[in-house]
Amino acid sequence: MSTTADKIAVLGAGSWGTALASLLARHGHPTVLWGRDAAMVEAIDQRHENPRYLPGIPLPDSLRATTDLASAVEGAAWILVVTPSHAFGETVRALAPLRPAGAGVAWATKGFEPGSGRFLHEVAREVLGEDVPLAVVTGPSFAKEVTQGLPTAITVHGDVPEFAQTVAEAMHGPAFRAYTGDDMVGAELGGAMKNVLAVATGVADGMQLGLNARAGLITRGLNEMLRLAAAIGAKPETLMGLAGLGDLVLTCTGDLSRNRRLGLALGRGQTLQDAVREIGQVVESVQTADEVMRQARRHGIDLPISDRVRAVLHGEQTPEEGLRALLAREQKPEYPDTLFK
């Protein structure tokens, strides 16, 4: 297949996929957004609005949308996957035989592969082969604010520096700063764990435990990120940057976060089912909490906050019981001596 100058295919027409497709189109790149919902795709393509996920926010006239995956990726210079983590593997497998020769694949999906707990770059590499450039787009970014043109900073980590740079340059603009790195493991870990930790801070705020508790949970949550990162060979500086600390702070404090809103609802006494129904979109933490703890057990790392979130989400503990379990833990040094060595 031929490759059109810099056509970009974005797979996934949810809020984040639509926001990134809109950003790329506004930056002058021929951009096609693929989605499964025919009515929503038609609204994006013809009326330039995503009425379900980003109602009332105009999208660029140049942004095209389709339900035909082959048409979406044909001639693309590179492809950006922005689906929920549970649909990531399925989407990449459908993409594999259609991908134009030489087209790299990036994703802005956050989470692990359900069931196996594998990192998404491991899934992509297995499906796409060894020669396809890969990159992950992550960092503190709410879709609504990006489509409104509010200042945002993200980071792109890839296994081929030139491809990560290509993705970053396409996204970089007056109100959108895109940095680059080469630590895909750390970038993916931060993007997944922050969703689980946002539930914890949401629960605390829902229970009206105060700002001290919120700050403590965010900081000790970062500690959990750093310890698991060290165990799996990620770079600590990745977790101290946009992919870790930045995304953690945003998701734990901003009410646009679905995971924080889930925690708020649980802290106020709602059931998980009612809270998820009320939010009306995929809440990644419900699944990711299991996969985070699978990684922790695999590497022998104690993650008390993440584990309490998992227990609450599974109905094994109430939020009050989870809080008591955390507060009953023994006194210890703030950081292990070996963490930054």
Swiss-Prot record:
- Which InterPro entries does this chain map to? 6-PGluconate_DH-like_C_sf (IPR008927), 6PGD_dom2 (IPR013328), G3P_DH_NAD-dep (IPR006168), G3P_DH_NAD-dep_C (IPR006109), G3P_DH_NAD-dep_N (IPR011128), NAD(P)-bd_dom_sf (IPR036291)
Its GO biological process annotations read: carbohydrate metabolic process; glycerol-3-phosphate biosynthetic process; glycerol-3-phosphate catabolic process; glycerophospholipid biosynthetic process
| Pfam families in alphabetical order | NAD_Gly3P_dh_C, NAD_Gly3P_dh_N
Localization recorded for this chain is: Cytoplasm
User: From what superkingdom does this record's organism come?
Assistant: Bacteria
Q: What class of enzyme is it?
A: oxidoreductase
- Which biological pathway? Membrane lipid metabolism; glycerophospholipid metabolism
Q: Which PROSITE patterns match?
A: NAD_G3PDH
The keyword NAD is annotated on this UniProt entry: yes
Name the catalysed reactions: sn-glycerol 3-phosphate + NAD(+) = dihydroxyacetone phosphate + NADH + H(+); sn-glycerol 3-phosphate + NADP(+) = dihydroxyacetone phosphate + NADPH + H(+)
Active-site residues, record numbering mapped to chain: K194 (proton acceptor)
Task: Give the main location.
Answer: cytoplasm
EC number(s) on record?
1.1.1.94
Keywords of the record: Cytoplasm, Lipid biosynthesis, Lipid metabolism, NAD, NADP, Nucleotide-binding, Oxidoreductase, Phospholipid biosynthesis, Phospholipid metabolism
Q: Where does sn-glycerol 3-phosphate bind?
A: K110, G139, S141, K194, D247, S257, R258, N259
Q: Does the keyword Electron transport apply?
A: no
GO MF annotation, one? NAD binding
Q: Where does this protein hold NADPH?
A: S15, W16, R36, K110, A143, R258, V282, E284
Q: Name one GO cellular component term.
A: cytosol
HAMAP family from the xrefs?
Answer: NAD_Glyc3P_dehydrog
Tell me the protein family, please: Belongs to the NAD-dependent glycerol-3-phosphate dehydrogenase family.
Annotated function: Catalyzes the reduction of the glycolytic intermediate dihydroxyacetone phosphate (DHAP) to sn-glycerol 3-phosphate (G3P), the key precursor for phospholipid synthesis.
* NCBIfam families in alphabetical order: PRK00094.1-2, PRK00094.1-4
Q: What is this protein called?
A: Glycerol-3-phosphate dehydrogenase [NAD(P)+]
